[in-house]
Structures are given as C-alpha cells and as structure tokens.
Amino acid sequence: MAKLLALTLVGLVLALYKNHRSSYQTRLNAFREVTPVELPNCNLVKGIETGAEDLEILPNGLTFFSTGLKYPGIKSFDPSKPGKILLMDLNKKEPAVSELEIIGNTLDISSFNPHGISTFTDEDNTVYLLVVNHPDSSSTVEVFKFQEEERSLLHLKTITHELLPSINDIAAIGPESFYATNDHYFADPYLRSWEMYLGLSWSNVVYYSPDKVQVVAEGFDFANGIGISLDGKYVYIAELLAHKIHVYEKHANWTLTPLKVLNFDTLVDNISVDPVTGDLWVGCHPNGMRIFFYDAENPPGSEVLRIQNILSEDPKITVVYAENGTVLQGTTVASVYKGKLLIGTVFHKALYCDL
C-alpha cells in the first residue's frame, strides 16, 4: 500500500511538472519560427553593438538610445562596461550615433545600466529624459535635462520607491511624473526567476509623482512596454509572457480602467506611439525561449508589428518586419520618423529602414 501511494505521488508530481513545463513553453512561444518580412534599404546603425533596448525620437528627429543593458538571465555582449545614452540625428543623410556626456556628480556612471526611457517636453521647450536604471540589480528612475547645444545630459534627480522594485519601462507625463511597469513583483534575482517560471502574474503598473504613488493596474505576466495615446486619454500596456497588449482608459486622478485586450502570437515588448497617426509600433520576440536561453547557433529572431485603429472593433495588425536573427537579434523597440523605421534590440544591434 505504501509503495502504491508513493508511486501515485510520484506520478502526480511528474504530471504536474509536465503540464507546467508545457505551459512555460507556451508562454515563451518556444516553438515559433519566423516567416521573414523584409523592408527596402535597411542599414545597421553604426556604433551600436551591445543593444538599444529602448529609443525615443523627438519631433525634430533627434533620437535617444538606451544601450548596454545588463538584465538577469539575458545575454550581454559586454557585461563589464556600464551602459550609455546615445544620440542620433535622423535628419542626416547618413545618421551616426554619439555618446551623450552625463553632467553632474550625483550619478554613479560606473554602475549606469539604462533600460526603458521616456521624454517629456515642458512648456518652455525644456526636454527631460527619464531613464530606468538598474545599478547593482536595483531599480531607479534617473531624471535628466537634455542640453542640446552641449550634447549632454544634466542629471537632476534619482527616484526610488518601494512600489518600484523591478521597473522595465516608463511613460513620462511630467519632469518627475510617470507611469511605470514592474516586470516582476520581487527585486531579488532568485525570487524573480521563480516568479517568472511559475507564471505568478504578480507584476503591475504604478503611477508616480512627487505627491502620490499608487498601483494602477496589476495581475500581469511580465508587464513590459507602456505608451500613452496622442490625446492622452488611453494607456497601452504590453504583457510580454501573455502575448497581449492592454488598453486602459486614463482618468483625471491618474487611475486606469481596463478597456480592451489584443492577443498576439509573439512576445510584445516596447510600445511606441506614432506621433502623426497614433498607430502603435511594437518591438517583439517571436520566440522567447531563444531570448532567455541564448544560443549563438540558434539566435533569437526579430519582429515589428504595426497596430492601426487600436480602439476600433477590428484593429489592423501588420507584421512590418521579421527576421530570423541573422541580421538582428532580440527586437525590443521600433519607432518611425518621416518614412523611416528605427529598430532596437535588447543586447544586439539597431537597424534603420525605409518604409
């Protein structure tokens, strides 16, 4: 009888493990292969070799890149060097990147590890760049003032809060105010790995201002990219491991109400809102297994989606670019400027294409 009970327990454990492993593979889209979609006249951005996890294009074509991210469980081609913020002018015939010098003695440059970024332009045309930073595996938001003539960033402030333990991306709504996604509930790398493996869906979105901080949405399986509609009425949130983009209605008190959900056959990362049309441009990972378990012989592919009329009953979703990793590995972000598409990756290169 004891042997039968033991055998039954072993069988149950194995069945649960097999079922959970299948669920984990589904969340990572482990068996997805890429069908290539090409664009004309694509060129790699010179000077980006260790990723451009996020990017922001100003109305005048100046573009900020967040580069050199070191993230637990993700490949890094230069793990010993700090990250950088790069600048590129998309109006140039052959645009090239240059490093923005960080001014001020309040930021430890040696541990600078930039992730998501967002800009806010004040009424006097002052441009603030808000940067998610992971110094020593922690999470902060660094507030910079962009000094265009000097081509530098003046560090103004470091923001930390207990409700911001694992920030991934931010959407700035003021010089020190923003919505932020926490991709995990825990900050500890060991607990984060179990949280992700078990699919606990404990990540959330937080509204932060100097006067008020609150969780405004929760229950996500790895909340990732976030964007705000052109009219400021809606917030878009990418749920990476559920393959979803959520649309929320934004209220005057900064709370959010869920409106609709779109499902995809890819892991949706950062969201950029087209400044002309309001379309969403989304950097995606077709196969998440290849991102989290990197193999140079079988690298992660890249995919860019365009979502038109997202608020309608029948949004139009187009795969604008897709590639199996021979050119671009691990796309995280895509944005447009005057008929050009700029694509960034988590640890690899960046691409610049005609549309």
Curated annotation (Swiss-Prot):
Tissue specificity field: Plasma, liver, kidney, heart, brain, small intestine and lung. In the plasma, associated with HDL.
Compartment(s) of residence: Secreted, Extracellular space
Residues of this chain annotated as glycosylated in UniProt: 253, 270, 324
Coiled coil: none
Reactions catalysed according to its record: a phenyl acetate + H2O = a phenol + acetate + H(+); An aryl dialkyl phosphate + H2O = dialkyl phosphate + an aryl alcohol; an N-acyl-L-homoserine lactone + H2O = an N-acyl-L-homoserine + H(+)
PTM section of the record: The signal sequence is not cleaved.
PANTHER family (alphabetical): PARAOXONASE, SERUM PARAOXONASE_ARYLESTERASE 1
Name of the protein described by the UniProt record: Serum paraoxonase/arylesterase 1
Organism this protein belongs to: Mus musculus
Encoding gene, per UniProt annotation: Pon1
